[in-house]
Amino acid sequence: MSSGDLDANSYQTIPFLKDQIKNKGYKFDQAFKTVAYPMGVYSKKIKSLKDLKDGDSIAVPNDASNETRGLQLFEKAGIIKLKKGVGQTATKKDVVSNPKHLKIIELEASQLPKQLGEVTAAAINTNFAMGAGLSINENAIFHEPLKNNPYPNVFVVQSGHKNDAVIKKIDKYYHSKQTAAFIKKEFKGSVVLSSSK
């Protein structure tokens, strides 16, 4: 998109988009929210996060937006605590409470499913979990909310074009009953349609 070859794309969350704009200087606008891929915690070794033992290992994605998301997921589960006010920039250095002395391992997001047997539990993005045959509804031992997920993907356009008629039309089709039915049937709850705004 930055080269002008594309007018729009749809694959990133808002924190990821903001990080890319900040670090790479892209001139993009968020047009509308599309779908959410709720992040889940998966394990081959435990059935519940309550089963974590002292010194066990947990893994999170190592890219800026998804590491924060994974750490926040473990925090929501009551496993760790992050520094107050850290927002969308948390890394493992921002963990202020880790009562079970868990080893927090940062790995490339796409590698997390392959490394699942090497750690006690891992926070995995749904697209990579699905690619490994994992279902958030059937295999995750903890996950982000499926409805009103705080990390929807967004439809992104070149700066100054978010109110173009064609973009409004795409938004309308994206949020139609037919699209909602397709997503529900195709992804069986692992991907959920977000409200437009």
Q: What are the residue ranges of the model-derived segments?
A:
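A local structural motif
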Residues: 54, 79-106
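A bilobed periplasmic-binding-protein/Venus flytrap-type ligand-binding module shared by bacterial periplasmic
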Residues: 38-49, 151-164
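Short, glycine-/small- and polar/acidic-enriched structural segments
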Residues: 2-47, 95
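Periplasmic-binding protein-like
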Residues: 68-75, 174-194
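Short helices/loops that flank or line small-molecule/ion binding pockets
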Residues: 1-7, 22, 72-73, 93-123, ...
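A conserved helix-loop-strand patch within extracytoplasmic ligand-binding domains
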Residues: 31-80, 180
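Ligand-binding "clamshell"
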Residues: 19-31, 44-46, 118, 123, ...
